[in-house]
């Protein structure tokens, strides 16, 4: 199911680091941008990596656990927001236009049947998950199928010359599934990794935590088996994003991880295949409390902290600008010798 993840290219990494030391600036003066450029080289295997073709892949799926009152918004908003994406009217569309990135929308588990149209990939594994408070959200086979969808979508994008990919999501109730995954895989109590999602009040938050506790008690997901956790308390769109991560890493494409939902997918992916970790770039620190726990567990430092909690891939696409800047610095700055500028003595 999982393609072989190639190791980082240490020669390209060393060449990029060496070039950074010759550019017309004090070594290390551009901080994280220099680190990013070296990481891009190691991932892509190119000492002078380019970031031209960019895309955000949005996996969409519904959650049966919404029936427990864990979301401030109704389940039908998943379908409605997918249509909004297709019309170009969502936050991710505006930000992707600014970043000159494509928006790829994938129905991997929307409860409603969507009509075929340009810009939408119909790859439905199921009409949403089942209510995880009563039993497994999906079967293990369904989780594997959704992962395969994500990998296949990236395969198609890679054939177009994709240089950089962001993970995006749409699914009412998916912060509940993500919190359950985080609790199961980190061992943290649900209260420590569960936030207000799209805007729950105090009573709603307490109900959400109780539902997650019940789901974990009912399903007993095995923390030693991330696929078991994913299938029992996860979501189809989260599984799809696991596949996006695997597919990108297999093709040496850097993966920009968005917020809490994408972080949960990254936690599962890294639990299944540790070798994906170096391919991940954490875009931002989400307001969702569990996101910090996930990033710490993955050993990732976010590039941005803007108080975001929307999802859709918005934070990841904002980070595209910094990542492209890192590549441009490495590729376009002159060396001391080229510029005729004296280096330090």
Task: Enumerate the predicted regions with their spans.
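N-terminal loops that bind phosphate or other acidic moieties
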Residues: 1-345
């Amino acid at each position: 199911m999982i393609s072989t993840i190639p190791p980082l290219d240490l020669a390209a990494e060393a060449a990029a680091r060496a070039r950074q030391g010759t550019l017309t600036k004090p070594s290390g003066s551009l901080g994280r941008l220099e680190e990013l450029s070296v990481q891009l080289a190691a991932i892509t295997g190119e000492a002078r990596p380019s970031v031209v073709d960019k895309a955000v892949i949005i996996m969409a799926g519904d959650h049966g656990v919404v029936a427990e009152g864990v979301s401030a918004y109704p389940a039908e908003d998943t379908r409605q927001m997918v249509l909004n994406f297709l019309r170009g009217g969502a936050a991710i569309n505006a930000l992707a236009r600014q970043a000159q990135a494509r928006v790829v929308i994938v129905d991997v588990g929307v409860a409603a049947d969507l009509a075929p149209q340009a810009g939408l990939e119909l790859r439905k594994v199921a009409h949403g998950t089942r209510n995880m408070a009563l039993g497994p959200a999906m079967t293990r086979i369904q989780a594997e199928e959704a992962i395969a969808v994500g990998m296949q979508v990236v395969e198609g994008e890679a054939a177009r010359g994709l240089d950089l990919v962001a993970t995006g999501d749409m699914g009412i109730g998916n912060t509940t599934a993500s919190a359950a995954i985080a609790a199961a895989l980190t061992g943290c109590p649900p209260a420590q990794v569960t936030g207000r999602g799209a805007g729950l009040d105090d009573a709603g938050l307490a109900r959400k935590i109780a539902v997650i506790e019940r789901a974990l008690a009912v399903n007993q997901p095995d923390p030693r088996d991330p696929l078991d956790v994913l299938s029992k308390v996860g979501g189809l769109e989260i599984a799809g994003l696991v596949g996006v991560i695997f597919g990108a890493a297999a093709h040496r494409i850097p993966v920009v991880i968005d917020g809490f939902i994408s972080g949960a997918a990254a936690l599962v992916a890294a639990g299944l295949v540790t070798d994906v970790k170096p391919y991940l770039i954490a875009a931002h620190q989400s307001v969702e409390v569990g996101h910090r726990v996930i990033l710490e567990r993955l050993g990732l430092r976010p590039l941005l902290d803007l108080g975001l909690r929307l999802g859709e891939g918005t934070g990841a696409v904002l980070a595209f600008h910094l990542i492209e800047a890192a590549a441009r610095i490495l590729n376009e700055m002159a060396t001391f010798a080229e510029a005729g500028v004296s280096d330090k003595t």
